[in-house]
Design a protein with these regions (language model features):
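Aromatic, loop-rich ligand-recognition surfaces of beta-strand-rich domains
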Residues: 621-686, 699-746
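Structured mid-domain segments that build the active-site/substrate or prosthetic-cofactor binding neighborhood
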Residues: 233-236, 244, 344-445, 449
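Acidic, contiguous N-terminal accessory segments
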Residues: 17-100, 146-154
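Feature activates predominantly on carbohydrate-active enzymes
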Residues: 50-53, 57, 88, 92-287, ...
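Substrate-binding cleft/loops of secretory-pathway carbohydrate-active enzymes
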Residues: 302-330, 373-380, 406-414
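Bacterial Sec-dependent N-terminal signal peptides
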Residues: 1-23
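Alpha-helical scaffolding within the catalytic cores
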Residues: 23, 306-315, 340-352, 383-384
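Catalytic domains of carbohydrate-active enzymes that cleave complex glycans
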Residues: 420-601
Length: 746
């Protein structure tokens, strides 16, 4: 009754009287409260959170704690927080998460369109009118004033996108999410049913042995990778499973029925007939999930349009309660999608899906998965990409940014993307400037120059920017020696500017990590070159002290700032440091295998290290990245034979392998070492095995053997691949790789 009476009174004010007679609303004067925070007796959880947030931050600013009440006796003034009436929503086209902030008769009204609109209205009030900021979890700017007032206003704001996720560690923080107007996955999706759910619904461990026909037919053979979606038993199993799971989570509306993370879709006659009719492997998927959507009309069935299933079907339209999760994983990140010739197929695909689907959930990628701490200059494409996606009907967004301390410009990118998700047409440069000035204070001019230089350098070339790319790919462009030197000069000045402010200095040092990381990785790629770790002269090798110190400095900053894993595979700074120290400990002097010839049977995959067998004896041990200094074999056994060139008294023999399960790379099952004096008759000197399921292994493993006696010329390694990914792996049963590097003989 109170709320309705107040609203009725306010509606008697004309728009002109509002403009002419309103004055600023004083809420605190000399530390004394002049208003209360008014909520409805039936306030939603969001309204209560909004009221508490406003109370907390006004106290932080002014030292005055406003009371929260459900009743105000005239003539007392108030800040009201509640859901707008239906007629107000219709008049202002107010939608879920939207809000109105208005003033009238020395009162302030924050009216929600539903959802978290009241929280976001409070955030707007704190940011725009009271000067507060939250740049990262725990990093706030709070001005201090004993008196506070709000100018007269009538401000309506709605989100351009109805669901907004920026993935990463930062958004695990609820308060940070609220300040950035973001959602969490759990707000929409059933727990355990977000993506890649085929195996959860029809686990191969349960069914494959007795019913291989439930799974993909590839090259005439049934494999575990995907489901056969034209098999009626598969459909019935999925229906039964979903009914049981939905009973456990009755409040959850969106359920993912989506392909596993591989390319092995079914090629049986029935599936191929549909694929040919639809012109896309998405055909069987959409027909399958449409049946489920009809079976569960009160739920939403989410499915992927990803990699092989990205092109839209030509015949079948998704039902209204089917969500299309469209992914951009293949695209170049240096140019806006709609302006890049290499992205034309995606531009066509999103247009095609937009013609047949009303519920598109866009999964975009704004991070380098393999080298999250390396420079990844994509700030200039974030706004045009989100503008393009939103204009093409994608209003639910998952931005996979993998935000964490130490990831390249992580705090800035999360801050900018959040605001672009709410309003894609904001002034992005102003947002960047606001962040840089608030986060870096006196160091801001130099950080801004660094950002500008990175962007201008990649715009010059328009080179491919890959979400799995290695810094070496850009060693002659934005990561050239001259550019790295310029960036370092800026960071030197930035550190000097804030040397008396330890907290700000730490932020500057963390933002310098990507430049240090790139220099280390580029140096590792050419150990004996001009940017490498060693100076070579007459077969002697001297470690450059400045490069060694660079590794130490990088690791120290990581430790001091609790830097999160350095890539998607969870590489810890300590592991990276140890692997790098191992890497730069070149195996040259006393190494009989250095630059000697190796033959392989069969040959390694040419897409890694160009299949160059000389990498196995170049004196450099591979580190954590399979794309640098490693050679790979997929799902097979192989042999490597080293020719020392002449008979020698070899005693200790070793070979190294890599472990990166997210990239489907495991250590081999076993390595057998054999030696020979003539290359014809070999004798075994040892066999080493890797036991267990390889769920947790060291990143690198050295297989060490001892030759008990006699001169040898040839060394042969017989390596048994693991071949199939183990049961614990998300792509269990898929082909696994073995990656091998440095052979050392002493």
């Amino acid at each position: 009754m109170l709320r309705n009476a107040l609203l009725a009174l306010l509606m008697t004010l004309s728009a002109s009287s509002f403009a002419q007679k309103q004055t600023k609303v004083q809420i605190v004067s000399d530390g004394k409260p002049l208003v209360s925070i008014l909520i409805s007796p039936k306030a939603s959880p969001a309204d209560k959170t909004a009221a508490s947030m406003l109370q907390e931050y006004i106290q932080k600013i002014s030292g005055c704690r406003l009371s929260i009440t459900e009743k105000v006796d005239p003539p007392a003034n108030f800040i009201a927080i509640w859901e707008a009436e239906e007629r107000t929503k219709q008049k202002e086209s107010l939608i879920n998460d939207g809000y109105i902030i208005s003033t009238s008769n020395q009162n302030v009204f924050i009216e929600s369109g539903g959802g978290k609109g009241s929280i976001y209205g409070v955030v707007e009030l704190l940011e725009r009118y009271l000067g507060c900021r939250m740049y990262a979890p725990g990093v706030e700017v709070i001005p201090h004033s004993a008196s506070l007032s709000i100018p007269p206003m009538y401000h309506v704001d709605n989100p351009a996108n109805s669901f907004r996720v920026v993935h990463g560690n930062f958004t695990d923080d609820t308060l940070y999410r609220d300040w950035q107007r973001l959602n969490s996955i759990d707000e929409m999706f059933a727990k355990g049913y977000y993506v890649h759910t085929f195996n959860k619904l029809v686990p191969w461990e349960t069914y494959f042995t007795t019913h291989p026909e439930y799974y993909s037919l590839m090259n005439g053979k049934r494999i575990k990778d995907q489901l056969c979606l034209t098999n009626e038993d598969v459909y019935q199993i999925v229906v039964k499973k979903l009914k049981a799971e939905m009973a456990l989570q009755p409040d959850k509306k969106v359920w993912s029925v989506s392909q596993n993370d591989n390319f092995s879709y079914c090629h049986c006659d029935k599936c191929m007939k549909i694929i040919n009719e639809e012109g896309s492997p998405a055909g069987p998927i959409i027909r399958f999930v449409n049946r489920l959507a009809a079976e569960f009309p009160e739920k939403v069935i989410s499915t992927l349009a990803y990699q092989f299933s990205r092109p839209a079907p030509k015949v079948t339209k998704p039902l209204p309660n089917v969500q299309i999760m469209l992914c951009t994983i293949e695209l170049n990140r240096s140019k806006p999608m709609d302006q890049d010739s290499t992205s034309r197929s995606f531009v066509k695909d999103i247009a095609d899906w937009g013609k047949i689907a009303s519920n598109i959930y866009l999964w975009d990628y704004t991070v380098n998965f393999s080298h999250s701490t390396s420079p990844f200059p994509n700030l200039h494409v974030l706004q045009p990409n989100l503008q393009f996606l939103t204009k093409n009907g994608a209003h639910q967004h998952f931005q996979q940014s993998n935000t964490g301390v130490g990831h390249e410009m992580s705090e800035l990118k999360s801050y900018l993307i959040s605001r672009l998700l709410w309003k894609p047409d904001i002034n992005a440069d102003s947002v960047i400037s606001d962040f840089v000035n608030g986060y870096f204070e006196d160091a801001a001019p130099y950080i801004q120059q660094y950002i500008d230089r990175l962007s201008s350098e990649i715009k010059k070339t328009g080179e491919w920017l890959d979400i799995y790319g290695h810094p070496v790919s850009h060693a002659s462009t934005f990561l050239s020696a001259s550019n790295i030197a310029f960036y370092n000069s800026l960071f030197d000045k930035a550190e000097e500017a804030v040397k008396a402010k330890p907290e700000i200095l730490s932020r500057v040092k963390v933002y310098r990590l990507p430049i240090q990381y790139a220099a280390i990785e580029i140096g590792k790629n050419d150990m004996f070159g001009p940017r490498g770790f060693y100076i070579e002269s007459n077969r002697t090798f001297e470690l450059r002290p400045e490069m060694n110190q660079l590794v130490e400095d990088f690791y120290q900053v990581c430790k001091d700032n609790n830097v999160s894993p350095l890539n998607e595979s969870g590489l810890k700074p300590e592991e990276y440091y140890n692997a790098t120290k191992r890497f730069i400990d070149v195996q040259v002097e006393g190494n009989l295998a250095f630059r000697k010839t190796v033959i392989a049977q069969p040959l390694p995959a040419v897409k890694y290290g160009e299949g160059n067998l000389a990498l196995l004896t170049n004196g450099v041990k591979g580190a954590n990245d399979y794309k640098a200094h490693w050679l790979g074999w997929e799902a097979k056994d192989f042999t490597l034979t080293l020719d020392l060139g002449s008979l020698d008294n070899a005693k200790d023999i070793s070979i190294s392998t890599l472990y990166d399960p997210k990239s489907w790379i495991l250590h081999p099952s076993s390595v057998t070492c054999l030696v020979s004096s003539d290359g014809k008759k070999f004798r075994e000197i040892g066999k080493l095995t890797v036991t267990g399921d390889q769920k947790n292994e060291d990143v690198t493993h050295d297989f060490l053997f001892t030759n008990p006696s006699g001169k040898i010329r040839f060394v042969k390694f017989s390596i048994a691949g693991t071949k199939a990914l183990p049961a614990w792996h998300p792509s269990a049963g898929g082909d696994s790789w073995v990656f091998v590097d440095e052979i050392v003989v002493r």
